[in-house]
A protein has these predicted regions:
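Bacterial N-terminal signal peptides that target proteins for export
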Residues: 1-7
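Bacterial N-terminal signal peptides
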Residues: 7-16
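A generic hydrophobic-helix recognition signal that picks specific residues
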Residues: 11, 56-60, 183
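Non-catalytic pre-domain segments flanking phosphatase-related domains
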Residues: 18-64, 72, 79, 86, ...
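C-terminal cap/substrate-recognition subdomain and adjoining C-terminal extension
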Residues: 22-29, 33, 41-43, 47, ...
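Short, solvent-exposed loop/turn and secondary-structure capping segments
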Residues: 71-74, 79-82, 199-200, 275
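A metal-dependent, Asp-based hydrolase signature
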Residues: 74, 79-165, 170
Length: 336
């Protein structure tokens, strides 16, 4: 009888355990990130600390080039502008003698040509700005957006074997999705001309125009009687340029609030980092460091004037440094 009782007890325990649902492993919100302290800081901030922030104040700002999309050797804006310059020369060969058109031709042949990349400014003339401003001068704004979208989604980028439109970092796209799932409002804020972001972001990563902040090229309105108004691109920009503190001016003017999270990849994003660091809510600032020469490129996190003490700034302000080589398990959206 004792043996029967023991057997019944064992069977009861086995039955109860078999009926009890097994714990389900939580879904990893950042599967393309390696298991590091950086990933733990991100999941702790977004999954835990963000609960202390009212939903209407959960605002995150991201740079674009070099932060969520590749910018080396050519970023989206300059790739499209170069093609525009080449097509102008085909229509008017006399333009070929001008320096900015010569630069565009050189980069179309060799995107890493240092005779161009290291000499944008000559005798006080910024030929990078010249290429960008002249490439689609007097073009209808919406027509340009369609042109740029077609070019970026059909033209293969150097080195990667993918079209430009696929050169988004998979880990960063996961981070954007994770933030959205936790009720964050996200804005892309970079020095890139706003028109370039409008051409690729809505269809590629699902960001509508209302969430894009960039340098605004001047537009001249035209009001035809038989169709909707059009806006013609001019060779100038509306100030301030969306870089450094210009980003913060545009963020505050547009949003009217201080964000709680900022992510960038150059010292030009330090302004955004300083801004979020003043928030009364839990906040986070992170720099993506390009140190992976095998899967992408290695380059310093500044443009123009060297900033050798950039890591000191990160350390002093408790900003995060995310090294691509260590943090990204996978780099590209559609390719390992």
């Amino acid at each position: 009888t004792n043996r029967m009782g023991s057997l019944l007890m064992i069977l009861t325990v086995v039955f109860l355990f078999s009926c009890h649902p097994k714990p389900v492993d939580p879904v990893d919100p950042l599967p393309s990130w390696n298991e590091t302290d950086i990933k733990r800081q991100l999941t702790d901030y977004i999954g835990v600390k963000a609960a202390q922030i009212p939903e209407e104040d959960r605002i995150a700002v991201f740079d674009m080039d070099g932060t969520i999309a590749c910018e080396t050797p050519l970023w989206f804006e300059i790739a499209v502008a170069i093609q525009g310059m080449i097509e102008q020369v085909e229509k008017d060969p006399s333009l070929a003698k001008l320096t900015e058109y010569q630069y565009a031709r050189k980069l179309s042949v060799n995107p890493t040509d240092t005779t161009v990349l290291n000499h944008w400014v000559v005798n006080g003339v910024n030929y990078l700005d010249s290429i960008i401003m002249k490439s689609f001068d007097q073009t209808d704004h919406e027509e340009y957006i369609r042109y740029a979208r077609n070019y970026l989604t059909t033209t293969e980028a150097p080195k990667y074997g993918m079209v430009y439109g696929d050169l988004f970092y998979q880990p960063m796209l996961e981070l954007l999705e994770y933030l959205e799932a936790n009720k964050f409002q996200i804005y892309l804020v970079c020095r890139l001309l706003l028109e370039k972001k409008k051409s690729i972001c809505p269809q590629t990563i699902g960001f509508d125009r209302q969430h894009l902040l960039g340098t605004c090229q001047a537009l001249s309105p035209v009001y035809p009687k038989d169709k909707e108004a059009s806006f013609i691109i001019q060779k100038s920009i509306y100030q301030p340029k969306n870089d450094g503190d210009g980003k913060n001016k545009n963020i505050y003017t547009r949003l009217g609030k201080v964000p709680v999270m900022a992510v960038g990849n150059t010292t030009g994003d330090f302004g955004m980092f300083h801004l979020v660091s003043t928030s009364k809510y839990p906040h986070l600032a992170m720099m993506i460091n390009h140190d992976d020469g095998e899967r992408e490129y290695i380059y310093e996190p500044y443009h123009g004037t060297a900033v050798p003490n950039w890591q000191d700034s990160l350390r002093i302000n408790n900003w995060i440094q995310a090294d691509m080589s260590k943090e990204f398990k996978t780099v590209w959206k559609n390719k390992n």
